[in-house]
A protein has these predicted regions:
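Helical hairpin unit composed of two closely spaced alpha helices linked by a short loop
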Residues: 371-392, 397, 402
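Catalytic-core elements of nucleic-acid end-processing and repair enzymes
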Residues: 434
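Active-site donor-binding acidic/aromatic loop of nucleotide-activated sugar
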Residues: 423-427
Length: 514
């Protein structure tokens, strides 16, 4: 096993970057020490310090409003900085980057994607056959390096345990390589079963590349498990943005993707990680509802491209992707568009797709999400759909994994309920599935939550599926979950306790910052 780092040719640049990061960290640390000194020693009463911090806060806010980022995100930071200038400025420079990845880094990554991307002609047939479908495709392809594919099969898994069994079999059948990229890998039966099959395939000479997010896996991965992974033959491991003593603003930019690719022929993505709660092996927050999709055919190339993006960004190594050749003989029913999103792309394709799906709905709009913390623009789109007679239903958890975030989610019910939309809380437990289904024609499945963190900060992935049998299966799965859920009526929502209303109001101000 090789733990991948920068290549030798990049060593000098890496040393310089590390030195600069340490210097910046020391400056930020000095600001933080000064901040605590202000609190503990009460020297904020000094008039010149107050004037300095308030002027600094105003200058930071002016700079903030020059940035091309979400308006709600700007407003929350503005309130924080102007209310608490010293603390606000320190936290803003530490964590307030939004999609503000260094320009050179973003250009380098986007340049890499541009050289590897495939731009096909499949979308052109949609303009006459399905103009709304063409609009959805364009909302992604015009804002990213990903395009729509045909000659692709999808298989939807409403049961993640079944998906996991199928994925293990596909890995067992691997002949050349296996790529895995997950936000969370956690000690337990699920991860053990993956390691077991990787050990066998590594000994057979199959090349394995494995990415996992350090923060996502920090609390749930034992040292002995890491050592076991390290012992796998022919495996290269990349721990995405590992935590360190150096203060790193990129700590916000987590790799939230979930991808498996086998030999460039089979791919998986969805909401599930390599952890026992997703398959029901361990009970957390009641029944854990999630789903995933298996992709075969042309569109697997897009999943491979997403994986190679994070690998390139983290290691500096350019993966030798297979030359894309469309298999016209492959079966396939509809159109499939897997795509990646993240802070290196200021065009935000996931957000644009979500809004476009909302606009495209004529009969129904079904949304499944673990969190509902969205900006006014998206809320207005949902309201417009509901007021236009579209059957709008949104499924969220009843048993939360994060109580504070759940309170923010409930605070967003009112605007949608008043417009005629319906909200359901999944009574059996925690709804972690991220889906949008529209009119028996279009569906989204992936890792993107309806919250600021997913849409502004994380590296995410998703798949738009159109005119494919999986759309009907996703609809049926959604309605089955709704049948087990409690509908939250407007009357019930308005009758919640006063303190709950007050806390939701206060939380709404800081929601974009969380």
């Amino acid at each position: 096993m090789k733990i991948v780092g920068r290549r030798q040719s990049h060593l000098f640049a890496a040393v310089i970057k590390t030195a600069l990061a340490i210097i910046i960290s020391l400056v930020i640390l000095a600001l933080q020490i000064a901040f605590y000194a202000v609190l503990l020693l009460g020297i904020y009463n000094l008039w010149f310090l107050r004037i300095f911090t308030e002027v600094l806060g105003i200058l930071v806010v002016l700079g903030l409003y020059r940035r091309d980022i979400n308006s709600s995100y700007k407003l929350s930071w503005t309130i924080f900085i102007l209310a608490l200038p010293f603390a606000g400025v320190v936290f803003y420079f530490t964590f307030g980057g939004g999609r503000n990845v260094p320009k050179r880094k973003a250009e380098k990554i986007n340049g890499y994607l541009k050289t590897k991307a495939v731009s096909g002609e499949e979308h052109k047939g949609l303009y006459s056959a399905d103009p709304r479908g063409a609009m959805l495709v364009n909302s992604v392809r015009n804002n990213s390096f990903y395009d729509v594919y045909r000659h692709t099969n999808t298989e939807f898994f409403p049961d993640v345990a079944e998906k996991h069994r199928r994925m293990l079999k596909d890995i067992e059948d691997a002949k050349e390589y296996v790529y895995l990229e997950y936000f969370i890998i956690s000690d337990g039966k699920v991860l053990d079963s993956v390691i077991d099959v990787l050990e066998r395939k590594g000994k057979e000479g199959v090349k394995i590349k494995f990415i996992y997010d350090d923060i996502g896996s920090k609390k749930c991965l034992k040292r002995k498990t890491k050592k076991r992974i390290a012992a796998i033959e022919n495996l290269e491991l990349c721990v995405y943005e590992p935590m360190s003593l150096v203060i790193n603003p990129r700590i916000n930019y987590r790799d939230h993707r979930k991808i498996t690719v086998v030999d460039g022929k089979v791919g998986y993505t969805g909401g599930d990680n390599l952890a026992d709660e997703y398959t029901g092996e361990k009970i957390r927050f009641g029944h854990w509802r999630d789903n995933a999709v298996r992709i075969t055919g042309d569109a697997v190339y897009a999943l491979e491209l997403m994986f190679s993006e994070i690998w390139f960004m983290s290691t500096g190594e350019t993966l030798k992707l297979r030359d894309f050749v469309s298999d016209a003989s492959a079966s396939g029913f509809g159109y499939v568009l897997p795509f990646g999103d993240g802070p290196t792309n200021p065009l935000n394709p996931a957000y644009h797709l979500f809004e476009s799906l909302t606009v495209a709905a004529e009969k129904y709009l079904y949304i499944s999400t673990p969190y509902l913390i969205i900006d006014n623009s998206f809320i207005n789109m949902i309201q417009l759909a509901a007021k236009s007679g579209v059957d709008v239903r949104i499924l969220v958890p009843h048993i939360p994994d994060k109580k504070l975030i759940f309170a923010m989610t409930r605070g967003h019910y009112g605007d949608i309920l008043k417009a005629g939309g319906k909200i359901y809380e999944y009574t059996p437990g925690f709804n972690h599935a991220k889906n949008i289904i529209v009119d028996d024609k279009y569906a989204f499945i992936g890792t993107v939550n309806c919250d600021y963190r997913s849409m502004l900060l994380h590296f995410e992935c998703g798949t738009l599926i159109m005119h494919d049998p999986s759309v009907d299966k996703m609809r049926d799965d959604f309605l089955s979950a709704v049948a087990q859920s409690e509908e939250i009526t407007l009357e019930k929502w308005e009758n919640r306790p006063f303190l709950t209303k007050l806390s939701e109001l206060l939380l709404a101000v800081i929601a974009p910052l969380l």
